[in-house]
A protein has these predicted regions:
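Gram-negative bacterial Sec-dependent N-terminal signal peptides
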Residues: 1-23
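Beta-lactamase-like hydrolase cores
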Residues: 23-64
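Structured C-terminal helix/loop/strand segments within mature extracytoplasmic catalytic/sensor domains
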Residues: 24, 32, 234-334
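Active-site-adjacent helix/loop patches that line small-molecule binding or acyl-intermediate pockets
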Residues: 24-34, 42-44, 97-216, 232
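Short Gly/Pro-enriched turn/cap motifs at secondary-structure boundaries
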Residues: 54-57, 132-134, 184, 276-280, ...
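Active-site SXXK
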Residues: 64, 71, 83-107, 229, ...
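Short beta-strand scaffold segments in enzyme catalytic cores
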Residues: 64-66, 288
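Short acidic-glycine loop/turn motifs at beta-strand connectors
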Residues: 68-72, 291-294
Length: 334
């Protein structure tokens, strides 16, 4: 399966590299504004409420941002409004472990397969004994966090936070209210981490790993931050605005492959079928998507569907990508 994912991602990146974004700035702006106007009044979905602080977030927040691989930034809506990054953080912690320890570390410690279970499933851990998971569901994500190098809890945490900031192009901070709220209610994740420890995938300090994981999910971001992070992946690991090579380009396909197959929880297959875009959602209301070689896009809107994905974000990203030819599999015959 891992070899398949490598080939899958390589095909995406190669196909995307043969095409460029043909639309003018005015056409890109128009695509964003059309999606904003089309979906701003829909009433579907509801905020996540299993984390009390998320239930209180303004459900009317709706911001869209797109960053091209040549560093052009397009935005509309509530672009300054911040939400907690939540599970989108998993993408970038996975990327950090890849950089520090190589691709085999991901496959060997938590796997790269979709589990067929909900993102915080204990059943999946027991069924697969902690293997055959992936870094974008909670068992794999907490394991990935436990693998980040550092001599102390603070050193590990600062390394993760600074890493996220390099993708976003600015220093990021933590929403302390969300962090406390999640910490008070994360007993399930504590249980998951102990199981992963029992099966030998987390090597040491499972509860510390859970605590750091909870803090990484509480990082505040706006739509522009998320689009910049996605665009860095779209640009082969190089931030298109700061110009910094944040991660090795060779590691980007591994990240995109898991995003494509497991990025939107139970609806990952449906999403990929309709858009072709590697993506990742978070229960804070954000979704990022990557059109390799073209752009990164992000939408923030807290109301979620039953799968835990932002309703507006899915619709808006699909429309914008369709308008801009973002699907890497949509290739015309020559």
């Amino acid at each position: 399966m891992y070899a398949f994912k490598k080939i899958f991602a390589a095909v995406v990146v190669t196909a995307a590299a043969t095409v460029t974004l043909a639309q003018t700035p005015a056409e890109i702006d128009s695509a964003l504004k059309a999606a904003m106007d089309k979906y701003k009044d829909i009433k579907e979905g509801a905020n996540a409420d299993y984390i009390p602080a998320l239930a209180k977030v303004d459900s009317k927040i709706y911001g869209i941002a797109l960053v091209t691989v040549d560093g052009k930034i397009y935005t509309t809506g509530d672009i300054k409004s911040e939400v907690s990054i939540q599970s989108i953080s998993k993408v970038f912690t996975m990327a950090k472990v890849l950089e520090e320890q190589g691709p085999a570390s991901i496959e060997n410690n938590m796997g790269v397969d979709a589990t067929g279970q909900v993102f915080n499933s204990i059943v999946a851990v027991e069924q697969y004994k902690g293997a055959e998971m992936n870094p974008l569901v909670n068992p794999g994500a907490i394991t990935a966090t436990s693998m980040v190098k550092g001599a102390s809890r603070d050193e590990i945490w600062n390394s993760i936070l600074n890493w996220y900031g390099e993708f976003a192009g600015r220093k990021l901070g933590v929403n302390q209210e969300v962090f406390k709220s999640e910490s008070d209610t994360n007993q399930r994740n504590q249980a998951i981490s102990m199981l992963m420890f029992a099966y030998g995938h987390i090597k040491d300090k499972p509860l510390q790993a859970t605590d750091i994981y909870t803090e990484q999910c509480s990082v505040n971001v706006n739509a522009k931050d998320l689009a910049m992070m996605a665009a860095t992946l779209a640009n082969g690991g190089k931030n298109p605005v700061t110009g910094k090579q944040v991660m090795k380009s060779d590691n980007v396909p591994d990240v995109l492959a898991v995003m494509a197959t497991a990025g939107l929880y139970d609806d990952s297959g449906k999403w990929l079928y309709h858009t072709g875009l590697p993506a990742k959602s978070g229960v804070g209301g954000g979704i990022i998507a990557v059109s390799p070689g073209k752009f990164g896009i992000a939408v923030i809107s807290p109301p979620l569907d039953k799968a835990g994905n932002s309703v507006r974000a899915q619709k808006a990203i699909a429309d914008i990508s369709n308008a801009l030819g973002g699907n890497p599999y949509s290739v015309k015959a020559h």
